[in-house]
Amino acid sequence: MICDPSVQQYSGYIDVSPEKHLFYWFFESRNAKPTSPLVVWLNGGPGCSSFSGLLGGVGPCRINDSGRGTLPNIHSWNSNAHVLFLDQPTNVGFSYGASVNSTIEAAIDTATFLRKFYDQFPQYSRCALHVMGESYAAHYVPAIAAQIVKDNKRNGKARSLPLASIAVGNGLFDMATQFMYLPEMACNSTYKSVANSEACMLMEKAGSDFAKSLEIARSSPSQETMVNATYAGYDILIPYQKAGGSPYDVRKTCTGGSLCDPYLNRISIYANQPWIRTDLGVRVDKEFVLCSTSVQDSFIYAGDEMIDSSQWLPMILAAGVRVLNYAGDADLICNWMGNKALMLGVQWPGNEQFAAAPDRQWVVDGQALGEIRSFGNMSFMRVYGAGHMVALDQPAASLAMVTQWLDHGAILAQSALS
């Protein structure tokens, strides 16, 4: 077995319909117990394979310098949980089939996938289910959880999926709220960025133009106005990128490659090796692309990027499902400022108490690794010293965070953990 030969693995396809075939790669926990939880991991894009997470800190191995092999990841999330990496929607990574261009359709397909996975592997049916992801997965994860909640009510206890929590890292829930914080993060964060005064001025102007586009989209909603607003949002980043900055880490310049990180380019080299395809049971004619621009474009042109996925959080919380939003505090595009503002704006019965809750230092083994704010089933976490991909930049903190969340949940609200 590849990547982590010490654990049981499964990989292949589950057909969510005759026309849709979703690829997955599953790793049992290194400390497998009957009570081990099951984490389903999704990357975003839209259009990016979950190999980004699997080989980018969340999974049990990382790519070596040549891109042809792997190295063990001692901070893998499967240290204490089963982890399933899913390429979704169709035509992302190794998945293929009829095209999908909306979060809602993708959520329906993923909920169907999970039911079929449990049917195929009933030994995991009692494992608490945690749906997690990063970036544009902030669209997918709440929608999937909401779909599961609805399906569970309809199907009854015997066919219910054991959804316990959701978690999203540096997510894009609502562009309208979060992108307003791009100039602030680029120009006034605790980190020194490449943005000079001219770039900051241009970002502020682009932010004003974005606000105007949002007003037009709200007053005259159509595919055209939604798409125009989406592009106006991304225009805020242009001055920063022209100055050479990475939208995924304000501490860095963009050095090329996916997410301005050459490491991620090696994932495609690894995944396209014939022996990898054979071992994983992948179609030999399916070329692996880490992030599909055609899938991303189809979501943009359908207006999907303007959806506010936080609309599903009150329903999820009401069902007793815990919600964690965590953010590396050096990311720009889905920065912690915008994510915190997003969470403070969620309308649920605990809104006032969550807003009044203190931000407490999160300390592990005597080291401050971030800040945590919690009330009830909702938590927001700022992770120090991490960019867009927390597990890649701060692997030890990432593992400590997810282990505490899975084992205890509310412990994250304490001011000191060791």
What kind of feature is each model-predicted range?
Residues M1-S418:
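Terminal and linker regions of secretory-pathway proteins
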